[in-house]
């Protein structure tokens, strides 16, 4: 009888137990594909990013022209840059769908895996923000100025902290250099934290749409789910290539085609589309400190989900009232994203304030109350 090579070599044994012979519930749907898609996005970002870093210059006098040089003079530079910029959008689409699936199917019950996932979200958001500054266009410069200025709300340390982050009295060469360093370094940290995320996930075993224990009925990951993931990967890559080749600037901001000018403020400063919902929450509170607190809490509120879970059932599969609340939350986030891209004027201000209030109400009041009501109706 021959021994399988993958089960005798230490490194291959880890790969085998994580991606080949991993016991997986037989009934997980396509919503479980997004974890692997995020891994593909991360690897694609690292590879394209490395090639871009070979030609990019982190200096305010030549950063903008170095991006133009990548597009015009570097062989396939335009393609590498378009793939890098648009796979960031794909990354966030996948990450939001991944979180949405976790919220719907009660994946947050695995508190360690969920907490590390929230940390990963914060790291990815930080990396994307640093990357947005690097082309040194108008929106890059003013986005960096506005967002880093939010640190000044911290009591006592605020103003000093802002100058320390800037490396001077304004966003300048030192800021660009350190942001490039962080943008280069963070993806590798994300890669390491993702490994820990997987480690904790495989410790408990994957959740499934029923929310019930599936230890008695599992199948190996390969070939069943590896081929299923491959289909998802091909669909995502097709969409990414469509964006990169046909409309690479659709998700970007036209202001970034103008080199950074500290003397001219753009009419409407806004971040990338995937941050618009948090930006709308930030803007909806007139007080600066209150806005920053709301911005932070809009992400950190995800850490409270294991504590606010009141239902006797894990998933929302058999809870129609909770499903209605969930889809209302999704619509609310879409409204916030839309409002974040609009100028600060009536009626967008009041819509943003109402949508922001609703966002926190869903997490803190509606979801727990509806879960308790369902328990009552089911006489549990």
From Swiss-Prot:
Q: Which InterPro entries match?
A: Cyt_b/b6_C, Cyt_b/b6_C_sf, Cyt_b/b6_N, Cytb/b6-like_sf, Cytochrome_b, Cytochrome_b_C_euk/bac, Cytochrome_b_N_euk/bac, Di-haem_cyt_TM
Keyword hit for Iron? yes
Q: Give the transmembrane region(s).
A: 34-54, 78-99, 114-134, 179-199, 227-247, 289-309, 321-341, 348-368
Bilayer topology reads:
Multi-pass membrane protein
For this chain, one GO molecular function annotation is: metal ion binding
Q: Where does heme b b566 bind?
A: 98, 197
The cofactor named in the record is: heme b
The entry's keywords: Electron transport, Heme, Iron, Membrane, Metal-binding, Mitochondrion, Mitochondrion inner membrane, Respiratory chain, Transmembrane, Transmembrane helix, Transport, Ubiquinone
Q: Where in the cell is it found?
A: Mitochondrion inner membrane
CDD domains, alphabetically?
A: cytochrome_b_C, Cytochrome_b_N
- What binding details are noted for the cofactor? Binds 2 heme b groups non-covalently.
**GO BP annotations listed:** mitochondrial electron transport, ubiquinol to cytochrome c
Residues annotated as binding a ubiquinone are: 202
* Superkingdom of origin organism: Eukaryota
The record's annotation in Pfam families points to:
Cytochrom_B_C, Cytochrome_B
Binding positions (heme b b562): 84, 183
Name the GO cellular-component terms: mitochondrial inner membrane; respiratory chain complex III
Tell me which family the UniProt entry assigns to this protein: Belongs to the cytochrome b family.
The record's subunit annotation is:
The cytochrome bc1 complex contains 3 respiratory subunits (MT-CYB, CYC1 and UQCRFS1), 2 core proteins (UQCRC1 and UQCRC2) and probably 6 low-molecular weight proteins.
The record makes one more remark, namely: Heme 1 (or BL or b562) is low-potential and absorbs at about 562 nm, and heme 2 (or BH or b566) is high-potential and absorbs at about 566 nm.
Q: What does this protein do?
A: Component of the ubiquinol-cytochrome c reductase complex (complex III or cytochrome b-c1 complex) that is part of the mitochondrial respiratory chain. The b-c1 complex mediates electron transfer from ubiquinol to cytochrome c. Contributes to the generation of a proton gradient across the mitochondrial membrane that is then used for ATP synthesis.
Name assigned to this protein: Cytochrome b
Supply the source organism for this entry. Answer: Zootoca vivipara
Quick one: which gene encodes this?
A: MT-CYB
């Amino acid at each position: 009888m021959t021994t399988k090579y993958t089960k005798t070599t230490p490194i291959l044994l880890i790969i085998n137990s994580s991606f080949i012979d991993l016991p997986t519930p037989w009934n997980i749907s396509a919503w479980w594909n997004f974890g692997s898609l995020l891994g593909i996005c991360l690897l694609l970002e690292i590879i394209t990013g490395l090639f871009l870093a070979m030609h990019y210059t982190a200096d305010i006098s030549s950063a903008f022209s170095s991006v133009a040089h990548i597009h015009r003079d570097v062989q396939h530079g335009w393609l590498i840059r378009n793939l890098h910029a648009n796979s960031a959008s794909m990354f966030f689409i996948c990450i939001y769908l991944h979180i949405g699936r976790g919220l719907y199917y009660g994946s947050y019950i695995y508190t360690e895996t969920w907490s590390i996932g929230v940390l990963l979200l914060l790291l990815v958001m930080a990396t994307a923000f640093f990357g947005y500054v690097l082309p040194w266009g108008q929106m890059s410069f003013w986005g960096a100025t506005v967002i880093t200025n939010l640190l000044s709300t911290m009591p006592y340390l605020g103003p000093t902290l802002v100058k320390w982050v800037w490396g001077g009295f304004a966003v300048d060469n030192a800021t660009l250099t350190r942001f490039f360093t962080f943008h280069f370094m963070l993806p590798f940290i994300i890669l390491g934290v993702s490994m820990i995320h997987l480690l904790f996930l495989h410790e408990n075993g994957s959740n499934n749409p029923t929310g019930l224990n599936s230890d008695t009925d599992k199948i190996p990951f390969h070939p069943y789910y590896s081929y299923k993931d491959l289909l998802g990967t091909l669909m995502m890559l097709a969409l990414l290539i469509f964006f990169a080749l046909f409309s690479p600037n659709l998700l970007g901001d036209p202001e970034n085609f103008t080199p950074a000018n500290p003397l001219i403020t753009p009419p409407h400063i806004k971040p990338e589309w995937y941050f618009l919902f948090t930006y709308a929450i930030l803007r909806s509170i007139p007080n600066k400190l209150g806005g920053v607190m709301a911005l932070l809490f809009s992400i950190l509120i995800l850490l409270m989900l294991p504590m606010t879970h009141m239902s006797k059932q894990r998933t929302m599969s058999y809870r129609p009232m909770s499903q209605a609340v969930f889809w209302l939350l999704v619509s609310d986030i879409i409204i916030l994203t839309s409002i974040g891209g609009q100028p600060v004027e009536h009626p967008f201000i009041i819509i943003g304030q109402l949508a922001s209030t609703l966002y926190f109400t869903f997490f803190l009041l509606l979801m727990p109350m509806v879960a308790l009501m369902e328990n009552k109706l089911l006489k549990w």
